[in-house]
Regions:
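Ribonuclease/tRNase effector modules and their secretory precursors
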Residues: 83-196
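Short glycine/proline-enriched turn or capping motifs at secondary-structure junctions
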Residues: 68-75, 181-187
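Domain-core detector
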Residues: 1-74, 80-125, 129-132, 136
Length: 196
């Protein structure tokens, strides 16, 4: 009988830890692109639906790591319990080829950091895939920190860990992502500072 109670407790823990919600704003379509998010900001000015609610519509979060609800007084959003969604992280290779490793932005110090870790522009595809894999896994497990929530949506920070190519060990650093509907996130900041 004790074994059965332990199993029940473990099953309850599994369901509780996988407990996700979706923000829903009645009568509005979710914004799947940054262009649609920007359009929602404009539409909010001519409607009675705020841009924050418009741009979090359809976004999914684990119950133990979600934005404060209600989002504001008189919020029309409601929460729907959902199964853990299929996660998808998007990271454009240009975040590395045209930003991190670009001589145009060399003064921000990010190119030097990645170079010190043994990475160069030729590694952009690898870095893109690594960021996607780690971000999907960590978002799925709720291993992220909520950031700014404003008229453009909810930002989150995810820690990425890379092996240094010159065998100095590993490096961990913050990356910035924007949350989109149905378990989608998109990289906005490929390097936001180191962590211990």
């Amino acid at each position: 009988m004790i074994e059965l109670e332990n199993i029940r407790g473990q099953v309850a823990d599994i369901f509780d830890s996988d407990s996700w919600i979706k923000f829903v704003h009645e009568g509005l379509l979710p914004a799947y692109t940054s262009g649609e998010k920007a359009k929602n900001v404009v539409l909010a000015a001519i409607s009675n639906h705020c841009s924050i609610c418009r741009n979090i519509n359809g976004c999914c979060f684990p119950k133990n790591n979600m934005p404060e609800y209600p989002l504001h007084p008189n919020c029309h959003c409601f929460l729907v319990d959902i199964a853990k969604p299929q996660m998808k992280a998007e990271c454009q290779e240009e975040k590395f080829t045209k930003y991190i490793f670009s001589s145009k932005y060399e003064t921000n110090g990010k190119k030097k950091l990645f170079s010190d870790w043994g990475y160069d522009k030729i590694d952009s595809r690898y870095l893109t895939e690594e960021f996607i894999g780690q971000a999907e896994e960590k978002y799925c497990e709720g291993e992220f920190e909520l950031g700014l929530l404003n008229e453009y949506g909810q930002r989150i920070s995810i820690i990425i860990e890379l092996d240094c190519k010159d065998e100095k060990g590993k490096v961990k650093f913050l990356t910035g992502w924007m949350v989109y509907p149905n378990g989608n996130i998109k990289l906005t900041t490929p390097y936001g500072g180191t962590v211990k």
